[in-house]
Amino acid sequence: LCNERPSQTWSGNCGNTAHCDKQCQDWEKASHGACHKRENHWKCFCYFNC
């Protein structure tokens, strides 16, 4: 995995990494997704293969 992008389909704070992971895979065709805190906000980030 070498490409991290904020989710294009997630709205609001990310508090459930498992849901973020599933949504990234199902809706954005990513390999993985996870919640991370950036700039004092929890966001869903999707990870894609190179």
Swiss-Prot record:
SMART domains: Knot1. One of its GO terms (biological process) is defense response to fungus. It is found in: Secreted. Disulfide bonds join 2-50, 14-35, 20-44, 24-46. Keywords: Antimicrobial, Disulfide bond, Fungicide, Plant defense, Secreted. Its main location: secreted. One of its GO terms (cellular component) is extracellular region. It comes from the Eukaryota. Belongs to the DEFL family. Possesses antimicrobial activity sensitive to inorganic cations. Binds specifically to the fungal plasma membrane. Has no inhibitory effect on insect gut alpha-amylase. This is Defensin-like protein 1. It comes from Aesculus hippocastanum.
